[in-house]
Structure formats: C-alpha cells, structure tokens
Amino acid sequence: MRVNPDELTKVIEERIKSYESGEIKEIGWVMQVSDGIVRAYGLKDVMTNELVEIETSEGEKIYGIAMNLEEDNVGIITLGDYKGIKEGDKLVRTNRIIEVPVGEKLLGRVVNPLGMPLDGKGEINTDDFYPIERKAMGVVTRKPVDTPLQTGLKVLDALIPIGRGQRELIIGDRQTGKTAIATDTIINQKGKNVFCIYVSIGQKSSGLARTIDNLEKYGAMDYTVVVAADASDPASLQYIAPYAGAAIGEYFMFNGKDALVIYDDLTKHAAAYREISLLLRRPPGREAYPGDIFYLHSRLLERASRLNENYGNGSLTALPIIETQANDISAYIPTNVISITDGQIYLETGLFNAGIRPAVNIGLSVSRVGGDAQTKAMKRVAGSLKLDLAQYRELESFTQFAADLDEATKKQLTKGEKLTELMKQPQYSPMEMEEQVAVIYAANEGYLDQIPTDRISDFERQFLAYLKENYRDTLNKIRESKDIADEIKKELNEAISKFLNVFR
C-alpha cells in the first residue's frame, strides 16, 4: 500500500485545524491564608498590584491584589471575605491591574471601591473602565491654576481661596467640622458644572448615611458619586478606595470637565495601609508606618491637576482630610500631607467650641496657589482682611493679661470681633461670590462700626435680602464682570446707606 504524501499532509492539516487553541493561564496555589493575606507559590511572572483570581474549593471566586513579590512566594491581599480560602486552592493571573467603572452613569450612586453599587438602585451599566493606579500627568500637560473653585464659605473664598486643579488639605481634630466644609463645598457646586466624588474611608456607617442624606436633601447627588469603604470593610478595600475615587474623577478631567474629589480621611487610609504592610511583614518605620507611606499619598494627590488646552482643559481638584490628635499638626502623616498639598485649612477645637464656625485658624491656614484663581472683586475687598483677623487673634491673647488698653488697641479689637462674627456661617447655607463681595465690602468701608457685634448676622441676612430685592442688577454686574469697578462701589455705598436707615 502506497501512502500519498499530499493526502497525508492534508489529513494532518485538517486535524490540526480541528483542535481549539486553549487559553494559556498562569496558575498558582495557596500556601497559607490568615488575616486577609494569602501566601501563594507559582505565579512566577505576576506583576505588582496585579489582580489575581482565587478559586475556592466550594467554587467561589475571590479577587486579590499581588502586593509582595518574593523569591519563593507571592503575598496577596484579598478584596472580600477570605474565610472560604483554604491551603491548596488555585489562583489564576488576570494580567491586568484592578479597574473601576467610570462615567456619568455613576452620578447619584453610592459604590464600593470596586465600583459595585451599595445603594440598591440596580446595576451600573457603563462601558468605560479606568485603572485605579495611573501615573500623574506630566508638567507639559498642565497649566497654572487660574479658575476659582467656590466653596460658598466666606472665610475660605475670601481668605484661603481654592482654585480648580489645586490640592488643599483640610486638617483638624475630630468633631471640628472637617466633613461639614467638604459637604458644603459639594452643595455649592450646584449649577457650576463641577462633578464631585466623595470618598469615605474607614468612617462609621451612620456618619456616612447622614452625609449622603444631606447631599440628597440639597440636590447635590445629581452631580456626585460616593465611593464608600466604611469601618467594617477590610483594610484592602479602605486602601484602594481613594485611588478608585481619583480614577472616577480623572474620567471627567480627561473629557475636558471639572471635577472635585474629597478624601475623608487619609489618616484612616494610612492606618489601613500600615495594617496591610505589617501583615505582609514589611519592615516598619516611624510610628510603625512602612517606608513608602509618603509615596502612598504623593502618588494619589499628584493626580489632581489643571490640564492645558492641548489636553482638554479639564481639572481635578483634591480636598484631602486629615484628622489630628490634640491639635498636633507636627505628627508624621499630617506633616507628610501638608508638604504634598498646595496649602491647608486648619480647624481648631477651641474656635469650634467658642462658636466660631467654620472654626478656621487664619494664622495657620494658607493657600499657596489659590490666590491666582481668586476673582478680582474678591481680591480687592479681601486684601487686608486676613491680616486684620490674624492680628486680632494675636491681640486677643495678649489682652487677657492687660488691664487697661489704649484707644487704638480697643478699636482694633472691636473691628476684629465684628469681622470674626461676619466670617461665621451656618452649615448648608453657601453664599454666591457676589453676595460675599457685597458683605465684605460693607465691613471694609466701616459700615459695621455702628452695628452691635451680636447684630452682625442679622445685618448680613437682612442686607442680602435687601440687595436681592432692590439692587439685583448690582449683584449681577459683580457676578458677570468678576470685578468691583467704581460704578459698582458707588451703587453698593448707596445701597448700604439706604439699608442702614431701615435696618432694625
């Protein structure tokens, strides 16, 4: 029997074609599991921070992140309940870094750091996914901060202005109003085309529920995404939460829009990372934090930026929050974040308890780049305000020891008291820029000298109502021109004089 080589070749080719090429997967096995950390062997080519799929003996799939790449094993943090994982379970590489869903379909939703909904409003159907870790945009892609981000709070917009693309730290002890400033800022973005991302890290569920309830009450959830990793969530989820929030914010920035992301708070984020690092047996450093704790926050906050025209003109503003112990801003994490950010808003327990709210310490608070973004109108009226208030606080502490004071000091103290009273503002009542300018202008021109200190808040409320009713055009001119020309000053002087005749 003669074999035809051509026929044989044809049969072999057909057989080869009939085989389905299987997907090549790199697998490993669990050696040890404890406290949410899995030690595995195999996975020789796994990347750092790569997403790994763990298949339990019950058929359940649990995801983890490869954090420690050692010679003979890989240290993996699990993103969920690790109790079903046993020694010998199989692991599979995914060949990708962890990603989160992004886009406008997330607005109004509460999600966990993996982008899974927590609000019971159904699935989020979006086609866009961003990696949670991304290299910050380079210097050539950026432009200087030049547009204000109005918080609606007089004391901040006048004295510690924030620009779009800035990183401004909110720092203070517990219960000093840090989250209140953040939520007021979100509420004030209504109608200003700024998309907000509120990242809750290690907070109590009751506190988070209250914040979400307030955002819904004031219509702020329409343009806000809440990323929540509360105190009961594993440290791994608390660790990735701010990066997920930054990725959601970057989507808006890369699409030429303005976004604001609030990290509440990075003290708990650092504690979660310390917990993970110690469980992975990484060497501890100062205050038991690992050596790369600075890089943890710098790579996160550097992602906030103001892009130039060639890259879409978008911006991502970051307001990280840090909780101090006994007003100690010289501790490790506070000093790290202060050195990374473009300024800080320092809230003081003493001021808060004295009823001065927002409890901003003017002397220790600063905005390094926000002044360039401040409107001309606000710059003109708020010029000497910060100095006056800082000097008043200094004088006030000295006068506790002095019995008799000269007239000039008494006058300065009275002025300082009235300005401090004017800077007070109730929560959930943000003010428009033109209203702030009008009120501060009245103080600068000495019109408050004849008003008793305890009537300042009444004066402000009634004066703004009077302006809206009788001088709406003047307010519109300030808003549109963003300046306070001589003509506007003349109209404001006329308005204040007329109002003082009817003020009671």
UniProtKB/Swiss-Prot annotation:
Residues binding ATP, per UniProt: 172-179
A GO molecular function held by the record: proton-transporting ATP synthase activity, rotational mechanism
Compartments, as annotated in UniProt: Cell inner membrane
UniProt superkingdom: Bacteria
Subunit (UniProt): F-type ATPases have 2 components, CF(1) - the catalytic core - and CF(0) - the membrane proton channel. CF(1) has five subunits: alpha(3), beta(3), gamma(1), delta(1), epsilon(1). CF(0) has three main subunits: a(1), b(2) and c(9-12). The alpha and beta chains form an alternating ring which encloses part of the gamma chain. CF(1) is attached to CF(0) by a central stalk formed by the gamma and epsilon chains, while a peripheral stalk is formed by the delta and b chains.
Protein task: Produces ATP from ADP in the presence of a proton gradient across the membrane. The alpha chain is a regulatory subunit.
Protein name: ATP synthase subunit alpha
Species of origin: Petrotoga mobilis (strain DSM 10674 / SJ95)
